[in-house]
Amino acid sequence: HSFENGKLIPVPSTVDYHLDYTEPAGDINIKLKDYIKFVQLNLQGIHGENNYLKADTYKFIHKGIENYSMGWYNIYENGKELSTHSGTAGTYYSLVHIDRIRGKAFIIFTNSFNQETQQAVRLLMRKLKENYGS
């Protein structure tokens, strides 16, 4: 959905939607089960298991340089280490948090994007982590 004049408007699949070339992975087309697998591979790699990539590569991607990662935002607080990533191209919003210490991940996908969506996703993420441990 797009957000126009205060209303969510469905975007038909026939719309020829183009992103700016500076968008590195914007609007990636992936099935949820495949994205879950992608995140699971990252979790396994962070915990030392070689799979699609070597474990050292995952560690570099997530923590390679102090206060920097490759495509992930790092959060260090209250004894926790999280890799997070969010994305939108204006018609959806996604958020993933990977708890690198506990080996858990939380993934939220929506089919709309506006401030209310972002706020709802943040609240849902907080509740998921409260209820399922992170």
What are these regions (language model features)?
Residues 1-7:
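Mobile, glycine-enriched helix-loop/loop "lid" segments at the mouths of ligand-binding/catalytic clefts
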Residues 7-134:
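Catalytic loop of the DD-peptidase/beta-lactamase superfamily, centered on the K-T-G motif
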